[in-house]
Amino acid sequence: MPSQLLNTVLSYLTDILLSLSIVGSFLTIFTFMLYPKLRSYPIKLIIYLCMSIVFSLFFFEISFRSSNSLFCIPAAILVHYFFLANFFWTFSVSFNFFQMIVKRNRDSEFYERYYHLISWGIPFIIIIFCAAFKKYVDRGGFCYLEDQYSVYFGFFMPGVIIVCSNICIYVFVAKEIYKTLRHTPTQKRQTVKEFRVYFSIFVSIGSSWIFGFIYMFSDSNSIIGYIFLILFSISTSLQGFFIFISYCLNYKVFAHYSRSFTQYGVSFFKRWENLDGETTQSGPTGTTDSSSTMTSTTTTTNVYSA
């Protein structure tokens, strides 16, 4: 397949998948902001993760459209920042799950301030260093870090730390689930379900990091380069959509939306019935008045006739 045609197909595919992911992340944020009763503390962390996904994908798309423009460098900085924030929020979500299952910490919300410091603060420090040494450039098709060393220390190394940390966390959590919850089937099923969701999110984001890193160090015009570019585009673009399916397509969310639409529908029909009733009442009144007027006119005519 000609490279030009492949680039065109990949561009359209990426745009579609990016749109799905952004819409999925936005709907997840919207749903849990709309219904506070569904917004548990772990869900709050998922909302922050979705925010980082929305911004990272948005500026990722902008970076490909900002080549040879004044917005190229700012787009490169923002892409780098929000992708790093994306990685660090997966760590925060995983560590919070570790606190609940392994440590059985009832005050896990105490750590939220530290999650924010880690997930927003460390990426900020990294991009400050990269920007200070002018490592963001236009790479001829998109805007990102200048060379392999910048990618290695500014993107790969933080990713390695996060991926290794998350692997250790999920190993401990899996062992704890197997060891302590085997005698409580109901609770086990729910916890295993949560574990699968969290682990799937980690795999999705971790795989995009791996594919993106390999693509950065491969020949972009080779078959291997194209393969990893496609894998990176797909895995990156479906993160938000996967989270939406995992957290919003369930009975509780459907029940809340159904209740809201039912209440809105009942309220709408009540207003319509009241309006229809007022119209019906005004009809007979108008007829009576008209009849009275006609009677009065007839009487007056008869008097003058007499």
Curated annotation (Swiss-Prot):
Principal subcellular localisation of the protein: membrane
Location of this chain's protein in the cell: Membrane
Any one cellular-component term (Gene Ontology): membrane
Region Disordered, annotated ranges: 279-306
Ranges of the Extracellular topological domain: 1-15, 63-70, 135-152, 218-222
GO biological process terms on file: cell surface receptor signaling pathway
Keyword Transmembrane helix: yes
One Gene Ontology MF term: G protein-coupled receptor activity
Homology family: Belongs to the G-protein coupled receptor 2 family. LN-TM7 subfamily.
Name of the protein: Latrophilin receptor-like protein A
Classification of source organism: Eukaryota, Amoebozoa, Evosea, Eumycetozoa, Dictyostelia
Encoding gene, per UniProt annotation: lrlA
